[in-house]
């Protein structure tokens, strides 16, 4: 009985961790003649916090936060150090529907269908490459199935 409880607890905790990892930043979709979403922010580092910790907390990629904070030690920025959060993005010049992967920016954009009220949003996630020097396949694709 205890073993079953521990297994369920493990999956519950693991599920919560995965949910946190996959959270995106959501922005209202601007009109078609506007390509910029978000805004640059500045926060102050807490004690023992790394740039990687800050990037994870704010849905940013490692390269994004390091390039926005040149001259700051990525592993020990120091308590109270101002950290620039590059949370302003230029939407890719593609149709604003479905999933768009901007490889150069290392960012994924998801344009879901409009809500029942007609509101449109865009979700954005940092992404990473699988392995250095491997080519990423280019083209239009379609998700035909999903397993959970």
Ranges and model annotations:
Residues 1-6:
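N-terminal secretory signal peptides that target proteins for export/translocation
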Residues 8-20:
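Bacterial N-terminal signal peptides
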Residues 26-59:
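Primarily a LysM-type cell-wall glycan-binding module
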Residues 46-76, 118-120:
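LysM (lysin motif) carbohydrate-binding repeats in extracellular/periplasmic proteins that recognize
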Residues 63-72, 81-97, 123-130:
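N-terminal post-signal-peptidase region of extra-cytosolic proteins
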Residues 92-148:
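Gly/Pro-biased beta-strand-loop elements
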């Amino acid at each position: 009985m205890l073993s079953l409880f521990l297994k369920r607890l493990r999956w519950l905790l693991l599920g919560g961790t995965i949910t946190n990892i996959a959270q995106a930043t959501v922005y209202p979709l601007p009109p078609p003649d506007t390509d910029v979403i978000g805004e640059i922010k500045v926060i102050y580092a807490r004690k023992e916090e790394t740039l990687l910790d800050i990037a994870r907390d704010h849905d940013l990629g490692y390269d994004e936060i390091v390039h926005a904070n040149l001259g700051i030690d990525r592993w020990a920025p120091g308590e109270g150090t101002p950290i620039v959060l590059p949370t302003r993005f230029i939407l890719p010049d593609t149709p604003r529907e479905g999933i768009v992967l901007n490889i150069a920016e290392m960012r994924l954009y998801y344009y879901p269908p409009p809500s029942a009220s007609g509101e449109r949003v865009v979700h954005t996630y940092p992404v990473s490459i699988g392995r250095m020097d491997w080519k990423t396949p280019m083209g239009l694709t379609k998700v035909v199935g999903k397993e959970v």
